[in-house]
Amino acid sequence: VMFRQVAILGTGLMGGSLAAALRARLPGVRLVGFGREPDISRAMELGLFDARADSVADALAGADLVVLAAPISVNCALVPEVAAHLPPDAVLTDLSSVKGPVVTAWRRTIAAMSDGAATQATPGLGDFVPCHPIAGSDRGGPDAADLDLFVSREVVLSPLPGNRPDSVERLQALWQQLGAHVTRMSVADHDRVFALVSHAPHAVAFAVAGAVAADGANPGRPDAAGKDAGAGKAVRDDGEEAPIRAGDHAGPGLLDLTRIAGSSPELWADILLQNQMPTLRAIDAVDARMQAIRHALLTGNRQALTRLLQEGADWRRTWQRHG
């Protein structure tokens, strides 16, 4: 049985896109939005929701699917209040890009509600099925909502021990009706994998963009050999001199590499901190590669350098063909 009423807590890009997709593909579903201003008012102006709620309790009343669609720290903070008002037969899910902290918040909450028995199947409490749609944008807010955001995208479900089988199946069917491909993996595997394929790459993109931004602050500084690295002035075709800043000469390659550095720093600080240890291990793996490349450069070892570059190129070309 498909869901009849969906409460979406968080009305920015992800929550708004989910509402738009549900509106377009499952028009019989009633959509209730709960979020901060000005997002919720703008979402209502855009017709993304049938109704707005002024409290979590109001949002959850009558819902058979509840979606945590706010930033991850907000989702974690909402869990106790959501659990207190979640209808017994409802399914709770989230759109967080890190699973561990939300699952921990849920388990602590249900343990407190059931006198310390940290069991998933607590009588009278709805069913939490963690979820992560692998989709997004460097834009935010309800104006960025895209009804096709999830089409042909992967959605990862991380079922918990004790989940009702029909909860997982209904949620999977919902995402498939929105055009997504569904994969299941454990919470721990999810956070390890996405630390390497998403979280560490975002950190790298921000770092490269920051290094480019810092260039030109000290024109004419010595290079590693103590020689002048340049006068720090460029002559344009109109004869005017201008300070040399590397970023002024960036081409498509740098723009491709740093595109995701246009995302919200506040959002990504939250994600990186919430997935701290897996992301640190992923950054260490990237750093080990960079150090190997650096050593090959330092020693002039063309064979080693080519091999390191080839390993990356092989994966990229294979992924581009089949990914």
Task: Describe the predicted segments one by one.
Residues 149-228, 232-260:
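Internal alpha-helical scaffold of NAD(P)-dependent oxidoreductase catalytic cores
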Residues 56-86, 90-93:
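Rossmann-like NAD(P)-binding element
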Residues 243-312:
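Interdomain hinge/lid region at the active-site interface
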Residues 5, 28-30, 127, 154, ...:
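Residues at the starts of beta-strands that form the adenosine-phosphate
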Residues 81-143:
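Rossmann-like NAD(P)(H) cofactor-binding subdomain of soluble oxidoreductases
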Residues 3-5, 89, 152:
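Phosphate-coordination loops involved in phosphoryl transfer and adenosine-cofactor binding
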Residues 1-61:
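NAD(P)+-binding Rossmann beta1-loop-alpha1 motif at the extreme N-terminus of oxidoreductases
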